[in-house]
């Protein structure tokens, strides 16, 4: 119903007092959650037997060390990330989130009928985006990951893309098992991919083995999660075709299996070309994920 709740991208800082910014963000999120529940309820009534899901920006966080303070900080991060789906699935706010509102002096206006609306509009499945994991530490000097829309502490055991997003295929399996164990609902991965710089050869070919390897490893780990009991309804990539990256406003940060002739300034013919990954992913689709060679 709602994609990536809640990015706060629609909140204009100049119109909100600084001390009310967090409260304003949670108020806007509440409106999204109620609207989602209303849509789910209406869809179920209009189309009996229909299935409606939510979408979570999955940001799995590991503790940087096994120090108890790092573990507690990590737990808080993961609870915050999951609470959106908690409301979608269970139809109510987790008590831990409500207590957090109290501690921070956050007042979210909820209409008397909102509780019943949320409970009547629980989703049937959970979908998520997955790009990376991060770690958490209470150490203020811990190295941070560069260039991300959401900052975290760098994981020394993982490689990174040119934009600092850490590549963690096993983290996808971890995340899917976590979500399925928590919600007992079918899952879908609706965004997964890596931004990379592609080079067009003199003959027009585009060789992107790094993209093939990224998807090979992630799809393989998803298969292992299925083998362990996770019910998966589907998987889609971000994105089939090159497009402007939302996090950096760059065309040169390319995600697609299809190359688009356009640069960061908007120059180019917009002509489209198949990358090597296009032909590889065609085989993956035809084999329903069995052929990853």
Q: Model-predicted segments: where are they?
A:
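Active-site region of glycoside hydrolase catalytic domains
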Residues: 1-293
């Amino acid at each position: 119903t709602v994609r990536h709740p809640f990015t706060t991208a629609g909140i204009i800082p100049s119109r909100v007092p600084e001390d009310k910014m967090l409260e304003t963000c949670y108020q806007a999120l509440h409106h999204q959650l109620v609207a989602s529940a209303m849509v789910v309820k209406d869809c179920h009534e209009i189309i009996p037997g229909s299935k409606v899901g939510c979408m979570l920006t999955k940001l799995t966080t590991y503790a940087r060390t096994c120090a108890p303070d790092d573990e507690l900080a990590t737990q808080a991060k993961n609870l915050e990330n999951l609470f959106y789906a908690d409301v979608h699935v269970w139809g109510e706010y987790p008590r831990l989130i409500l207590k957090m509102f109290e501690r921070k002096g956050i007042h979210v206006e909820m209409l008397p009928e909102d509780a019943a609306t949320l409970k009547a509009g629980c989703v049937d499945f959970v979908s998520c985006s997955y790009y990376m994991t991060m770690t958490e530490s209470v150490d203020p000097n811990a190295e941070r990951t560069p260039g991300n829309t959401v900052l975290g502490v760098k994981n020394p055991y993982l490689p990174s893309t040119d934009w600092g997003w850490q590549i963690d295929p096993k983290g996808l399996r971890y995340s899917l098992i976590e979500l399925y164990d928590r919600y007992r609902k079918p899952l879908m991965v609706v965004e997964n991919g890596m931004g990379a710089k592609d080079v067009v050869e003199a003959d027009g070919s585009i060789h992107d083995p790094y993209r093939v390897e990224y998807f090979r490893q992630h799809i393989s780990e998803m298969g292992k999660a299925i083998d362990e009991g996770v019910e998966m309804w589907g998987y889609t990539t971000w994105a089939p075709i090159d497009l402007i990256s939302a996090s950096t406003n760059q065309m040169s940060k390319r995600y697609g299996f299809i190359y688009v002739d356009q640069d960061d300034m908007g120059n180019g013919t917009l002509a489209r070309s198949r990358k090597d990954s296009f032909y590889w992913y065609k085989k993956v689709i035809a084999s329903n994920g069995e052929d990853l060679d």
